[in-house]
C-alpha cells in the first residue's frame, strides 16, 4: 500500500461490494468526503458496520490504484 494519509470524520457506508472469492465482505464508504473501499479479505470489513455514522480516524492509502482503508479507529 502506498501514499497512506490519515483522515478524521464521519464514516458513511455507501454500498456493500460483491464478496471476495473466499466469501469475505467488502464495502465502499466515505470518510469526510474521501471515498474509499475495504481491502479484499481484510478483517476491517467485519468491523466497518459498527462504525457507520460515527466519528472515526482512518488511514487511507492507494492499493492497485484505488483508495483503500488501511486501518480505522473510533474517535
Over which residues does each language-model region extend?
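Structural detector for short beta-strands of small beta-barrel domains
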Residues: 2-23
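N-terminal compositionally biased, intrinsically disordered segments and leader/signal-like regions
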Residues: 6-9, 36-41, 69
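Beta-strand secondary-structure signal
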Residues: 10, 26-28, 57-59
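OB-fold (S1/OB) nucleic-acid-binding surfaces
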Residues: 16-39
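Residues that cap or initiate secondary-structure elements
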Residues: 17, 35, 44, 64-66
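Residue-level recognition of conserved beta-strand positions in structured domain cores
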Residues: 31, 39-40, 60, 71
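Short nucleic-acid-contacting surface segments enriched for D/E, G, S/T with interspersed K/R
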Residues: 42-59
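OB-fold/S1-family single-stranded nucleic acid-binding modules
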Residues: 59-75
Amino acid at each position: 500500500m502506498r501514499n497512506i494519509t490519515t483522515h478524521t470524520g464521519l464514516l458513511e457506508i455507501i454500498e456493500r461490494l460483491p464478496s471476495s472469492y473466499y466469501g469475505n465482505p467488502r464495502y465502499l464508504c466515505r470518510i469526510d468526503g474521501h471515498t474509499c473501499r475495504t481491502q479484499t479479505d481484510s478483517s476491517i470489513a467485519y468491523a466497518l458496520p459498527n462504525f457507520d455514522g460515527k466519528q472515526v480516524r482512518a488511514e487511507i492509502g492507494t492499493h492497485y490504484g484505488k483508495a483503500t482503508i488501511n486501518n480505522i479507529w473510533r474517535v
